[in-house]
């Protein structure tokens, strides 16, 4: 894997979004911490421990896949799951990775935002967080400063552990000055669960509609939610972190 990067060679330090202070926020409730990543933006104490409160949505997404035992499967649900996997994998590969992280091509601001939205539905945080950490990964590949290195930290930590910590949760704004100037991207980064929740709700609604108007498809609201969102997203996550 190449170790060059377009990011500035500045040391990683606690950073805050443009226009915000570095004051440590008081606890604001678990729900706000899930939906507003800026609620404790300057958290630094014990930065390498797993924050289990913030990890709840990630764990719940995996457990929700077990609901397939109750909702069953249908060709319609499988098609939706496969299509959403492919479309979102493209958004991650072409835009989160090649465009936002490495800036390998140019596009319009509208296209940039559209694929940032699609990428945000993958439940892999916002495009700014993703790009900042990926740039840091390339800058410090296989060194103690690279939490994604299985050679240094072990497979399990590099696969699912590092981003569940306070240190991994922060967006390192000093790595992405070229992206942080866009307020719409900063909003997506701060409220990174809004798009996934909207997609899950839309899939539930689609399943309910199909169950009513096209019962011959054999699908339902719960089935479309489980296959189209939970299973598709979980498989997408593990495919992504296996590569990146």
List each model region and its residues.
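Non-catalytic, topology-defining segments of multipass membrane proteins
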Residues: 1-244
């Amino acid at each position: 894997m190449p170790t060059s990067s377009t990011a500035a060679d500045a040391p990683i330090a606690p950073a805050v979004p443009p226009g915000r202070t570095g004051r440590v926020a008081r606890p604001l409730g678990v729900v706000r911490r899930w939906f507003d990543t800026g609620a404790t933006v300057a958290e630094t104490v014990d930065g390498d421990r797993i924050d289990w409160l913030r990890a709840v949505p990630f764990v719940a997404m995996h457990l929700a896949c077990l609901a397939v035992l109750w909702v069953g499967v249908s060709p319609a649900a499988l098609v939706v799951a496969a299509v959403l996997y492919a479309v979102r994998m493209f958004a991650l590969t072409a835009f989160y990775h090649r465009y936002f992280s490495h800036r390998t091509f140019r596009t319009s601001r509208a296209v940039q935002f559209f694929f940032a939205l699609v990428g945000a539905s993958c439940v892999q945080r916002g495009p700014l967080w993703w790009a900042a950490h990926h740039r840091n990964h390339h800058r410090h590949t296989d060194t103690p400063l690279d939490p994604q290195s299985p050679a240094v930290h072990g497979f399990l930590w590099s696969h699912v552990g590092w981003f569940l910590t306070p240190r991994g949760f922060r967006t390192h704004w000093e790595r992405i000055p070229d992206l942080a100037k866009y307020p719409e991207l900063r909003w997506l980064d701060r409220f990174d669960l809004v798009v996934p929740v909207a997609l899950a709700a839309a899939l539930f609604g689609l399943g309910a509609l199909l169950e009513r108007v096209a019962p011959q498809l054999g699908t339902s609201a719960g089935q479309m939610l489980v296959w189209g969102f939970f299973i598709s997203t979980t498989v997408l996550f593990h495919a992504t972190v296996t590569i990146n």
